[in-house]
Amino acid sequence: MLIDPLTVVAQIINFLILVALLRRFLYTPITQVMKKRERLIAQQLQDAAHQQEVAQQEAERWRQMQQSLEHRQASFLTQAQDAADEHRHQLLQQIRDEVDSTQAQWREAVKREQHVFLSALQQRAGQQLAATLRCILQDLASANLEQQILETFITRLSHLPFSEQGVLETSLSNARGEELVISSTFPMPEDRKAQILAVLHQYAPAMESSVYQFVTIPDLICGIELKIPGYKLAWTIEQYLEQLEVKLNQVWDGMEKSWVEQG
């Protein structure tokens, strides 16, 4: 088979023309469309990536906001709990203080009532005991007891301490012109009066016996008393009763103090 060169050349030219036409009207538009599509897809992918990044950033922002909110909520809860605990502590302390104050006031009131009661009881008991003893001694008073009282008084008057003798002598010397009273619970026999005057004469020889006045005072309760301005000498059971009453008061004071401390 013979190959016509012209035909071959014509075919080649036709092929090249076809290729050029295909490239111009088919391949190039398709390529452009494909590139445009690729660019569009790339842009869409880029936009999607950007949107995803924005979404992630927004999600991160919301997560941080949620964490901050949770942290603030926890902080608020902690502060509220601390405030509630502090308020509860203050209320409890206030209640304790009020209870302590009430108890202290109650104890003080009880102590005052105890003091008033014990003082009244002390006074009444001492007075009653002294009054009872006075009645007993008055009932038991007899001539022998009176003589013994006079003997005791005369002995004491005759044997005064040296310092007291000086006081008596000075008082007698300064009492010139005044009545000097010698009191007794019972009427004094004349011989006993003479004995007393004799002893007093030793202390004041210049003193007249007439200045001495003997009187009877039942309230002395079994006793005798010499009273001069600036000096007094007495022996009475009343003195011992007063001492007893003082001792009783001291005992009561000690008991009261002990009860108050225990209360």
UniProtKB/Swiss-Prot annotation:
The keyword Repeat does not apply. The keyword Ion transport applies. One of its GO terms (molecular function) is proton-transporting ATP synthase activity, rotational mechanism. The chain crosses the membrane at residues 2-22. It is found in: Cellular thylakoid membrane. NCBIfam families: alt_F1F0_F0_B, PRK14474.1. Belongs to the ATPase B chain family. This is ATP synthase subunit b 2. It comes from Acaryochloris marina (strain MBIC 11017).
